[in-house]
Amino acid sequence: NDGRIHLEQAMEVFKSGKICYIDKPIGATLGQAIAIYEMAEKYNVPIFSSSALRYSPQNQKLRNGEFGKILGADCYSPHKVEPTHPDFGFYGIHGVETLYTLMGTGCESVNRMSSQDADVVVGRWKDGRIGTFRGIKEGPAIYGGTAYTPKGAIAAGGYEGYKVLL
């Protein structure tokens, strides 16, 4: 979970020439993330970074249109604030990645409201759809969401471990 050590760890993998997966966050700063990708390119090593939530079977079904077009989505995850990492980069990234898994790219406008217990971010996509992310600061560490489709409101997948990456 500590992105500050990922560059050092990844360098050992890159030197071995093995494919590299780095759990979120890829780095504690944008500079570290860029350095990791530059080193992967230098050593010609395939690399990817992701939240395992992207690959939950339910989220993949939603993404692939099994319930119809995603008309909008509301997603949530823990949002533990870690001073060594920017904003949602430590844990909030899980819910943000779930939202993008369901909605795809194209978010063009963002508004945010914060309180002691949560952060809520509302995004508008270029096609007019709206998606939200709730970063839970207090309360249980839960992951999930709701996707709105022509077939109704469908539960998004939560954390199912790392086996879904294989």
Which functions belong to the PLM regions below?
Residues 16-17, 42-43, 69, 106, ...:
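Structured helix-beta-strand junction loops
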Residues 2-4, 26-27, 53-55, 114-116, ...:
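Short beta->alpha connector loops
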Residues 1-4, 12, 42, 126:
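C-terminal helix-rich "cap/oligomerization" subdomain common to oxidoreductases
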Residues 21, 26-85, 95:
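A contiguous active-site-proximal alpha/beta segment in oxidoreductase catalytic domains
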Residues 3-23:
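Rossmann-fold NAD(P) dinucleotide-binding segment
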Residues 74-142:
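Rossmann-like dinucleotide-binding domain that binds NAD(P)(H)
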Residues 142-166:
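C-terminal glycine/acidic-rich active-site capping loop/insertion
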